[in-house]
C-alpha cells in the first residue's frame, strides 16, 4: 500500500490532532525550573520550564495568569497543570498552563542570592567604590568569547561611533568549566600588561546556568580590585549576575556597553565646542570683572588725585589766611582804638601838658619830684622842667 504524500501543513495538523486528542497530554502535571521569563504587555506570561537535561517552552494566557497569587521569578521551581499544544505555523509544541504552584526555589537561583547577600555584606557592591568611566577613552579592552554575537555587537557599535578608538580583545571562556578563571586571567592581563582605559566584560543572553561563570566569588573580587574601570555587559536586560553588582557600571546588553564606553566623534566635537564657549564666557567674565575693578580703581584714584588734594589744601590755606587776616586786622583795629582811648587819657594826665599851660616841675638830683619847700636845703641842686626844656638851679635862699 502506497502512502499519500503530505504537505508540511498536513503533517503539522496530523501531529496537532494526535497531541490534542491524547488524554495524558491534555492533563499534564509538570515540574521544573523557570527560566527565560517574560511578562508580556498583553498580560500573557512566557517562560521555559527546564530540568538538568531538557526544557520546554510554556505560555500562560492572561485569563489564567490573573489568578496567580504570587509573582513568578527566574530560577523558581514550580509545578504546572497544563496541556500540550502544537503551534501549527512553526511545527513546534509548547505547554499551555492553566495553573502554577511553587515547588521551591531553584538551587542555582538560591546559590546566587546567597552569594549576592554575602558579598553585599562584605561591602564590595557599595556605591562609594564605583568609579566614573573615562569620558574620552583611547583604548578599550574587551573580555568575551572571540566569536559570537556579543563581541560583534560591541565592536560594531564602537567602530560605528568612533573609528579612532583602539579595541583590544582578550578571548575568554564565558561558559562552562573554568570560564570564571579565564575571565579572571583577562582582567589581570589588562591590569598588568596592557594599558587600556576601560574594560568590558561581555556575554550574550542565556539561561542562568549558562551565565553562571559571572556569579563567581573570585571573579567578583578580581573586578573589585581592578585598577581599570569595568563595565559588566552580561546577558539581556532582564539577566542579572554578580559581576553586574560589583562592576563600576552595568550595561543591559553588550551593544549598550559599546555605547557607554565610546564617545561619538560628534560628541567629542560638541564637547570641544562647549568647552570653547565656556572658555570664551570665562574670559569675557574675567575681562568685565577686570574692567570693573579698573573703573573702581580709577574712580578711587580720581577722588584721591594728589593735584586735586593739593589744590584743595591751597584753597583751605587761602581761606584760613583770609580768615586770619580778617581776625588779625579786626584785633589790631580794636587794639588801636583802645590805644587811642588810652592815649587820650594819658594825654589828659600827662604832666607835660600841664607845663604847657605855664607850670613847671622841680626834681632833685635823683629825679624825685619836689612838692614842698621843706624838702629843699640851701645849696641843693635842683632841676626845673618847663614846657620847652629844663634848667639846673642852685638853691641859695629858701622862703617858707
UniProtKB/Swiss-Prot annotation:
CDD domains: ExoVII_LU_OBF. One of its GO terms (cellular component) is cytoplasm. It is found in: Cytoplasm. The keyword Hydrolase applies. It comes from the Bacteria. The keyword Transmembrane does not apply. GO terms for molecular function: exodeoxyribonuclease VII activity; nucleic acid binding. One of its GO terms (biological process) is DNA catabolic process. InterPro entries: Exonuc_VII_L, Exonuc_VII_lsu_C, OB-fold_nuc-bd_dom. Bidirectionally degrades single-stranded DNA into large acid-insoluble oligonucleotides, which are then degraded further into small acid-soluble oligonucleotides. NCBIfam families: xseA. This is Exodeoxyribonuclease 7 large subunit. It comes from Clostridium perfringens (strain SM101 / Type A).
Amino acid at each position: 500500500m502506497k502512502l499519500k504524500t503530505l504537505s508540511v501543513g498536513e503533517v503539522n495538523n496530523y501531529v496537532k490532532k494526535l497531541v490534542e486528542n491524547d488524554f495524558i497530554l491534555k492533563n499534564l502535571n509538570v515540574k521544573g525550573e523557570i527560566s527565560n521569563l517574560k511578562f508580556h504587555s498583553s498580560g500573557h506570561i512566557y517562560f521555559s520550564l527546564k530540568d538538568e537535561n531538557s526544557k520546554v517552552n510554556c505560555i500562560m494566557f492572561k485569563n489564567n495568569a490573573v489568578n496567580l497569587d504570587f509573582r513568578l521569578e527566574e530560577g523558581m521551581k514550580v509545578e504546572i497543570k497544563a496541556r500540550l499544544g502544537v503551534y501549527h505555523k512553526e511545527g513546534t509544541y509548547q505547554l499551555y498552563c492553566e495553573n502554577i504552584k511553587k515547588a521551591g526555589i531553584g538551587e542555582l537561583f538560591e546559590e546566587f542570592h546567597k552569594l549576592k547577600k554575602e558579598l553585599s555584606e562584605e561591602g564590595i557592591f557599595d556605591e562609594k567604590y564605583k568609579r566614573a568611566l573615562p569620558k574620552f577613552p583611547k583604548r578599550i579592552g574587551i573580555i568575551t568569547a572571540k566569536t559570537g554575537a556579543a563581541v560583534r555587537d560591541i565592536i560594531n557599535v564602537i567602530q560605528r561611533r568612533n573609528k579612532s578608538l583602539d579595541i583590544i580583545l582578550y578571548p575568554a571562556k564565558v561558559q562552562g568549566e573554568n570560564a570564571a578563571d579565564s575571565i579572571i586571567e583577562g582582567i589581570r592581563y589588562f591590569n598588568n600588561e596592557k594599558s587600556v582605559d576601560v574594560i568590558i566584560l561581555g556575554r550574550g543572553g542565556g539561561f542562568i546556568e549558562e551565565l553562571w561563570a559571572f556569579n563567581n566569588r573570585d571573579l567578583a573580587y578580581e573586578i573589585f580590585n581592578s585598577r581599570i574601570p569595568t563595565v559588566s555587559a552580561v546577558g539581556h536586560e532582564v539577566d542579572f549576575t554578580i559581576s553586574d553588582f560589583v562592576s563600576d557600571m552595568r550595561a543591559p546588553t553588550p551593544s549598550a556597553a559599546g555605547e557607554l564606553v565610546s564617545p561619538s566623534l560628534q560628541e567629542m566635537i560638541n564637547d570641544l565646542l562647549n568647552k570653547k564657549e565656556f572658555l570664551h564666557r570665562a574670559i569675557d567674565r574675567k575681562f568685565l570683572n577686570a574692567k570693573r575693578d579698573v573703573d573702581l580703581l580709577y574712580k578711587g584714584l580720581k577722588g584721591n588725585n594728589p593735584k586735586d588734594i593739593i589744590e584743595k589744601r591751597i584753597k583751605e590755606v587761602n581761606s584760613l589766611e583770609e580768615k586770619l587776616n580778617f581776625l588779625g586786622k579786626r584785633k589790631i583795629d580794636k587794639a588801636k582804638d583802645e590805644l587811642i582811648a588810652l592815649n587820650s587819657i594819658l594825654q589828659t594826665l600827662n604832666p607835660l601838658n600841664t607845663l604847657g599851660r605855664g607850670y613847671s616841675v622841680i626834681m632833685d638830683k635823683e629825679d624825685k619830684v619836689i612838692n614842698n619847700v621843706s624838702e629843699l636845703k640851701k645849696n641843693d641842686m635842683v632841676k626845673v622842667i618847663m614846657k620847652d626844656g629844663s634848667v639846673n638851679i642852685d638853691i641859695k635862699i629858701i622862703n617858707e
